């Protein structure tokens, strides 16, 4: 269960970094610095990819844990909250990167 908690923390970290880079992308694009904007865009996409992989690994860990015993209510709640944050934040970053 500690592994799952750590995965959840890393997902949040990756999404926060993706958000930061997406904001810098918009800022640089607005200032006409397309070279730097392009780099921030790529960095944001990389962070989104990392978050997606971690999300996938966490879902797999939860599935494996479910075969042995039911996760605690607290862990299930943390995962449900993390999943909702992941969906919301990843969608926000993707929208920013489409600008």
Name each region found by the language model.
Residues 1-99:
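Non-heme di-metal
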């Amino acid at each position: 269960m500690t592994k799952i908690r750590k995965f959840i923390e890393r997902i949040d970290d990756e999404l926060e970094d993706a958000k930061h880079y997406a904001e810098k992308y918009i800022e640089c694009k607005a200032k006409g610095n397309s070279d730097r904007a392009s780099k921030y865009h790529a960095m944001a996409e990389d962070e989104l990819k990392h978050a997606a992989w971690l999300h996938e690994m966490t879902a797999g860990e939860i599935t494996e844990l479910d075969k042995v015993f039911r996760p605690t209510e607290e862990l299930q709640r943390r995962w449900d909250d993390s999943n909702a944050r992941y969906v919301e934040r990843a969608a926000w970053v993707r929208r920013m990167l489409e600008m």
